[in-house]
Curated annotation (Swiss-Prot):
Pfam family, one: DAHP_synth_1
Keyword terms: Cytoplasm, Lipopolysaccharide biosynthesis, Transferase
Record NCBIfam families: KDO8P_synth, PRK05198.1
Protein name per Swiss-Prot or TrEMBL: 2-dehydro-3-deoxyphosphooctonate aldolase
GO cellular component terms, semicolon-separated: cytoplasm
Protein family according to the UniProt entry: Belongs to the KdsA family.
Disulfide pattern: none
Gene assigned in the entry: kdsA
Catalytic activities: D-arabinose 5-phosphate + phosphoenolpyruvate + H2O = 3-deoxy-alpha-D-manno-2-octulosonate-8-phosphate + phosphate
Single GO MF annotation: 3-deoxy-8-phosphooctulonate synthase activity
């Protein structure tokens, strides 16, 4: 079990939610989505972390919108955190960003493409902030054991207890411009002894599928989210937007903000059943 952002994280507790727009488009959008998500999760009793990126460093096209940049983005996230009283998360992309970002946010996130960059992963973990490490689309779930060990060792060397690492499944490459989610990976990644998070929106992404941008199949977000909750996860990650068709990044796989309450309500009910029933995979070995 981990305690982070003021709540307990683990399979002995209800799932927590990381959610928000893919990228910080404006201060107004950040406050609109964070405020609405706080209201929804508060009614459902779901622990919530607001997420949005200040820079999308791996866009398909060099001409695509990347975000407001680190300085402006962190100001917006700090204001959301202070004024709405919600914990915040954002991703970092290189070692130079780690310290200034860690000074503002409650949880760091590392991009899937960078999960094998040892010095980068160690730098994030050494902040002793919770770190959500996304599994690369190219990586087998059991390979996350070594990634988690690198991170945990760095945290221990920095004087922490090594209990600040989460691992996140976001789909595996399946041919060109496609991802598939192997639900076995959620159980396999438990072997890291880290809380496992499932990214239900990037898992339906079609990387580069629109040529200059990625496509997506948001209609399958509920399918995969329910499957993951039925397997059993510590947390869910879902990007959402008031108008996905107009989103400046990852709109095709974003959940419409006005559908989040309905989706989360069904997931909360399923999570209760799953965790009340227990986890049986070790009994079949």
């Amino acid at each position: 079990m981990m305690k982070a952002c003021g709540f307990d994280i683990g399979l002995d507790h209800p799932f927590f939610l990381i959610a928000g727009p893919c990228v910080i488009e404006s201060r107004e959008l950040a406050f609109e989505t964070a405020g609405r998500l706080k209201e929804i999760t508060g009614k459902l009793g779901v622990s919530f972390i607001y997420k949005s990126s200040f820079d999308k460093a791996n866009r398909s096209s060099g001409k695509s919108f990347r975000g407001p940049g680190m300085d402006e983005g962190l100001k917006i996230l700090a204001d959301v955190r202070a004024q709405l009283d919600v914990p915040v998360l954002t991703d970092v992309h290189d070692i130079d960003q780690v310290a200034p970002v860690a000074a503002v946010v409650d949880m760091l996130q590392t991009p899937a493409f960078l999960c094998r960059q040892t010095d980068f992963i160690r730098a994030c973990a050494a902040t002793l902030k919770p770190v959500n490490i996304k599994k690369g689309q190219f990586l087998a779930p059991h390979d996350m054991l070594q990634v988690a060990r690198k991170a945990r060792d760095a945290a221990l060397e920095a004087g922490g207890d090594g209990n600040n690492i989460l691992v996140c499944e976001r789909g595996a490459s399946f041919g060109y411009n496609n991802l598939v989610s192997d639900m076995r990976s959620l159980a396999i990644m438990r072997e890291t002894d880290c809380p496992v998070v499932f990214d239900a929106t990037h898992s339906v992404q079609l990387p580069g599928g629109q040529g200059a941008s990625s496509g997506g199949q948001r209609e399958f977000v509920p399918v995969l989210a329910r499957a993951a909750v039925a397997v059993g996860v510590a947390g869910l990650f879902m990007e959402t937007h008031p108008n996905p068709a107009c989103a400046m990044s990852d709109g095709p796989n974003a959940v419409p903000l006005d559908r989040m309450a309905e989706l989360l309500e069904s997931l909360v009910a399923l999570d209760r059943v799953t965790k009340r029933s227990g986890f049986l995979e070790n009994q079949f070995v």
